[in-house]
């Protein structure tokens, strides 16, 4: 038996090696769009004869045997699982004619000997304006019960990062129209921002407002990747986007965001790849010259899923049980998020810190890629100040006089100094009261309280709940307003005038209105 099998294996090996090494095969693999044949992977696989059979199923790991033409690593294989299309991604080559794959959906019901077809390309998903307002899963199938997606263009989820020559080297800030962010922790155009915050402090509302403002100010679109999040949260977000006007029900004109979900209940393969699916959709819009916002909630779940996949594939774990390829996996995702000469992808990533340990390898690896951090504080949200961004904890490498200009830098630092002084005086105020402070400190406290309130802002997406019309504030108006505050120009105005207004002119107008009402 062994002797008879040897001649069969040899041609398979000979055929597999040239197929992988042929230069002509490379462009097809890296091509950004798929041909008509590639869009019908089953037909293509049948034509090429790359049909194998299931040899072993261990949870999310499936071993598939091919007689010849072994599929390349990262190729998508397809099989029918009780009437549903099941996609497997090749992760390892075992011996001469077996591949080990990770399933993108449940393998319940899969049987040995079942036919599997090689699509000849990585997992490919639809891209284009047809994605706006829709929800897709990791393999590009709609999951919002709004009918099929009519996109005509498809892209593989594994793409190389842009070459150095394609990248834009100019440091620019992305003006969001949100005062606290633009002044104290400005976002880099094409940068990566870490969003830290507990439950109920306004992460979702801030994300919605950013999507709305980028669409208004830059005409850009947004992509939201839900990586290993709760199904309930994903469902709530979808409906909130419709209620707040960010998206139209069922997609179509007027929708500003595409949603890509791989929830907590999905197998690790889906959660490890859904971030790449979302990024592929975002890259299409960037290549069309757009400024794209790409949200990931939660980047920790991406690492966690990678760790599960690594263990399933039998790799020896690294520190704290994470995969040995942790930095490589993170880099492969993060390096694709950048500004090119065509457009930009600016990424806002919610980061869960396990056991509040910032030295844990998962968050520590993410921090290396971040340009800015936006910290949402419960103490600030309890004061009723929204967005509840902590002005002293949030940072940005863009807050540099060479990038934002000397005036912006000096005003931002003066605002932070005033708030820091107020923070250090709070213990004295709590114990002894305001009367025990010096006149200078009383003035600092009064200004700091006005600054705190002026950092609040009415949001467009919260209009339906608050009744206050949203405000999009120009950067120059923001700098002008806070400069006047720290220099004492508005010491005569009451604190209440600065709460939930846009520009300083709005605050002056509100003060006059309050004075008229009091009279």
From Swiss-Prot:
Subunit composition and interactions: F-type ATPases have 2 components, CF(1) - the catalytic core - and CF(0) - the membrane proton channel. CF(1) has five subunits: alpha(3), beta(3), gamma(1), delta(1), epsilon(1). CF(0) has three main subunits: a(1), b(2) and c(9-12). The alpha and beta chains form an alternating ring which encloses part of the gamma chain. CF(1) is attached to CF(0) by a central stalk formed by the gamma and epsilon chains, while a peripheral stalk is formed by the delta and b chains.
Biased composition (Low complexity): 1-26
Coiled-coil region(s): none
InterPro entries (UniProt xref): AAA+_ATPase, ATP-synt_VA_C, ATP_synth_F1_bsu, ATPase_a/bsu_AS, ATPase_alpha/beta_chains, ATPase_F1/V1/A1_a/bsu_N, ATPase_F1/V1/A1_a/bsu_N_sf, ATPase_F1/V1/A1_a/bsu_nucl-bd
SUPFAM superfamilies: C-terminal domain of alpha and beta subunits of F1 ATP synthase (SSF47917), N-terminal domain of alpha and beta subunits of F1 ATP synthase (SSF50615), P-loop containing nucleoside triphosphate hydrolases (SSF52540)
Family: Belongs to the ATPase alpha/beta chains family.
Pfam (any one): ATP-synt_VA_C
Record-listed E.C. numbers: 7.1.2.2
Chain spans, region Disordered: 1-40
Function noted in UniProt: Produces ATP from ADP in the presence of a proton gradient across the membrane. The catalytic sites are hosted primarily by the beta subunits.
Residues given in the record as ATP binding sites: 197-204
Membrane disposition: Peripheral membrane protein
Cellular component per GO, a single term: plasma membrane
Location(s), subcellular: Cell inner membrane
Gene for this chain: atpD
Keywords: ATP synthesis, ATP-binding, Cell inner membrane, Cell membrane, CF(1), Hydrogen ion transport, Ion transport, Membrane, Nucleotide-binding, Translocase, Transport
GO MF entries: ATP binding; ATP hydrolysis activity; proton-transporting ATP synthase activity, rotational mechanism
Name of the protein in its database record: ATP synthase subunit beta
HAMAP family attached to this UniProt entry: ATP_synth_beta_bact (MF_01347)
Reaction(s) the record says it catalyses: ATP + H2O + 4 H(+)(in) = ADP + phosphate + 5 H(+)(out)
């Amino acid at each position: 038996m062994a002797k008879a099998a040897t001649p069969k294996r040899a041609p398979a090996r000979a055929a597999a090696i040239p197929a992988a090494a042929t230069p002509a095969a490379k462009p097809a693999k890296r091509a950004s769009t798929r041909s008509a044949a590639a869009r019908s992977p089953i037909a293509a696989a049948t034509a090429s004869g790359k049909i194998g059979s299931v040899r072993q199923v261990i949870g999310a790991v499936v071993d598939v045997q091919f007689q010849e033409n072994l599929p390349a690593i990262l190729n998508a294989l397809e099989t029918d699982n009780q009437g549903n299309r099941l996609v497997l991604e090749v992760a390892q080559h075992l011996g001469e004619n077996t591949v080990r794959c990770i399933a993108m959906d449940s393998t319940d019901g899969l049987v040995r000997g079942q036919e599997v077809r090689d699509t000849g390309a990585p997992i490919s998903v639809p891209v284009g304006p047809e994605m706006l307002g829709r929800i897709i899963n990791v393999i590009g199938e709609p999951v919002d019960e709004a009918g099929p997606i009519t996109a005509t263009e498809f892209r593989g989820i594994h793409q190389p990062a842009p070459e150095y020559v394609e990248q834009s080297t100019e440091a620019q800030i992305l003006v969001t129209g949100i005062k606290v962010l633009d002044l104290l922790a400005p976002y880099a155009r094409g940068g990566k921002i870490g969003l830290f915050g507990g439950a109920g402090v306004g992460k979702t509302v801030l994300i919605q407002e950013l999507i709305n403002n980028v669409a208004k100010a830059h005409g850009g679109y947004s992509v939201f990747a839900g990586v290993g999040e709760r199904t309930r949260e994903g469902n709530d977000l979808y409906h909130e986007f419709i209620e707040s006007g960010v998206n139209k029900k069922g997609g179509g004109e007027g929708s500003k965001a595409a949603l890509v979900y791989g929830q907590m209940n999905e197998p690790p393969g889906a959660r490890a790849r859904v971030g790449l699916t979302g990024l592929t959709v975002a890259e299409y819009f960037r290549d069309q010259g757009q400024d794209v916002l790409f949200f990931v909630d939660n980047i920790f779940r991406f690492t966690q899923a990678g760790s599960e996949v690594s263990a399933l594939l039998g790799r020896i774990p690294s520190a704290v049980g994470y995969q040995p390829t942790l930095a490589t996996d993170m880099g492969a995702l993060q390096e694709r998020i950048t500004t090119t000469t065509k457009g930009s992808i600016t990424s806002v990533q919610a980061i869960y810190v396990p056991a509040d340990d910032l030295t844990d390898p998962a968050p520590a690896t993410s921090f290396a890629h971040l340009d800015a951090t936006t910290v949402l504080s419960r103490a600030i949200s309890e004061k009723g100040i929204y967005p509840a961004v902590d002005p002293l904890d949030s940072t940005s490498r863009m807050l540099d006089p060479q990038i934002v200009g000397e005036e912006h830098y000096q005003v931002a630092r003066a605002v932070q100094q005033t708030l820091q002084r107020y923070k250090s005086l709070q213990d004295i105020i709590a114990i002894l009261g305001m009367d025990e402070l010096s006149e200078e400190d009383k003035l600092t406290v009064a200004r700091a309280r006005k600054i705190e309130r002026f950092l609040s802002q009415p949001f467009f997406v919260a209009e339906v709940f608050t009744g206050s019309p949203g405000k999009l504030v120009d950067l120059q108006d923001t700098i002008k307003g806070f400069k006047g505050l720290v220099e004492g120009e508005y010491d005569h105005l009451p604190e209440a005038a600065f709460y939930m207004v846009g520009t300083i002119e709005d605050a002056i107008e509100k003060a006059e209105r309050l004075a008229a009402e009091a009279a």
